Amino acid sequence: MRPHLSPPLQQLLLPVLLACAAHSTGALPRLCDVLQVLWEEQDQCLQELSREQTGDLGTEQPVPGCEGMWDNISCWPSSVPGRMVEVECPRFLRMLTSRNGSLFRNCTQDGWSETFPRPNLACGVNVNDSSNEKRHSYLLKLKVMYTVGYSSSLVMLLVALGILCAFRRLHCTRNYIHMHLFVSFILRALSNFIKDAVLFSSDDVTYCDAHRAGCKLVMVLFQYCIMANYSWLLVEGLYLHTLLAISFFSERKYLQGFVAFGWGSPAIFVALWAIARHFLEDVGCWDINANASIWWIIRGPVILSILINFILFINILRILMRKLRTQETRGNEVSHYKRLARSTLLLIPLFGIHYIVFAFSPEDAMEIQLFFELALGSFQGLVVAVLYCFLNGEVQLEVQKKWQQWHLREFPLHPVASFSNSTKASHLEQSQGTCRTSII
């Protein structure tokens, strides 16, 4: 039977949970994960104190002036009167605040003194700080924002994916890559909803213990979907760069390689991360990343993909500028390249370049980082759907044709007006609806 939380410990845990949000994957942490760490420390402490009392020979030892004890957050070894005992900050505080402080007690003739300094001050958590309540409110607002963002992105992505799948004239390598990107954003949104539902549905102790394996699997799925999303953003950059830099290449062969890379490479890194977590940091539901070296198994490849996309973006702009300055380039090609340049500029946030700014950001910039990664990042799928589908001239033409055919079939005596003027329609008709006439 696990002990209940004392009021002082509850007061200490509240700001700890807030601080944990900056180290988790984008939502408020589970109370039972923190409790699990506390219980592990308690069990370890009681075992050490038991061995201390019995000694190496297994015989009962005389009790010193101050008997060893567990005070609900720290383990204090036995001591003789007149000595000051120092212990590290509790593990659950160190892993959440990344601060290595110390706590002290004096052993007197009357027993242990009070702990000094107070754990909340020595270990980097100020329970009297009025900003804790504001931060909690801010994080809850962020949660609402990213829930709305992922929901709207999910709806728009499903519609966009349905459109690209429904019209055969839109089936080509470029749109196949777009569809894989849509699926990665859909999985990212769904995994986020599943994570929130499983991890934060209950803080009851029995629930936490019974569903620990399930919530770890959810976190593995969540990390895979995040990495797959970044992988397909990189594939978009690689394909666009290849299209501009190489005159002739086998799109079918490249597509097979892109698919293997986009879905396969994240599986490798996530599997390595899961193995490392299981053997080296099997704490809670794996939603708190205290061991930086293990977390870099996930974070490193993501940052590398962002840097590669940034380099690709710079080179894409260089190629476009060179083509625009070439005198041999014809007028219609100049117009095409200008449209391509404008489209490429819109890809800056999609390539995740802004994440580089926060890759090694200090703790005081964490709230700004969370805003960009959660609030704005959740709408990324919506922007992708609009850019790659709803603003695509070929898609608009195919939808317009389908609408006109349906309207003529249902209302033959009432012809429908065209969505666009005749000049635009004629221009799109000349393209024959092929996927190769535009980049996005």
UniProtKB/Swiss-Prot annotation:
GO terms for cellular component: basolateral plasma membrane; cytoplasmic microtubule; plasma membrane. PROSITE patterns: G_PROTEIN_RECEP_F2_1, G_PROTEIN_RECEP_F2_2, G_PROTEIN_RECEP_F2_3, G_PROTEIN_RECEP_F2_4. Disulfide bonds join C45-C75, C66-C107, C89-C123, C215-C285. Its main location: membrane. The chain crosses the membrane at residues 142-167, 175-195, 217-239, 255-276, 292-315, 341-356, 368-391. It comes from the Eukaryota. It is found in: Cell membrane; Basolateral cell membrane. It holds the Pfam family HRM. Residues 1-22 form the signal peptide. Glycans are attached at N72, N100, N106, N128, N291. Gene3D superfamilies: GPCR, family 2, extracellular hormone receptor domain, Rhodopsin 7-helix transmembrane proteins. It is a multi-pass membrane protein. Phosphorylated on Ser and Thr residues at the cytoplasmic C-terminus by G protein-coupled receptor kinases (GRKs). One of its GO terms (molecular function) is peptide hormone binding. Residues 168-174, 240-254, 316-340, 392-440 are cytoplasmic. Residues 23-141, 196-216, 277-291, 357-367 are extracellular. Keywords: Cell membrane, Disulfide bond, G-protein coupled receptor, Glycoprotein, Membrane, Phosphoprotein, Receptor, Signal, Transducer, Transmembrane, Transmembrane helix. GO terms for biological process: adenylate cyclase-activating G protein-coupled receptor signaling pathway; adenylate cyclase-modulating G protein-coupled receptor signaling pathway; cell surface receptor signaling pathway; diet induced thermogenesis; G protein-coupled receptor signaling pathway; intracellular water homeostasis; regulation of appetite; regulation of synaptic plasticity. Belongs to the G-protein coupled receptor 2 family. G protein-coupled receptor activated by secretin (SCT), which is involved in different processes such as regulation of the pH of the duodenal content, food intake and water homeostasis. Ligand binding causes a conformation change that triggers signaling via guanine nucleotide-binding proteins (G proteins) and activates cAMP-dependent pathway. Upon binding to secretin, regulates the pH of the duodenum by (1) inhibiting the secretion of gastric acid from the parietal cells of the stomach and (2) stimulating the production of bicarbonate (NaHCO(3)) from the ductal cells of the pancreas. This is Secretin receptor. It comes from Homo sapiens. The lineage of its organism: Eukaryota, Metazoa, Chordata, Craniata, Vertebrata.
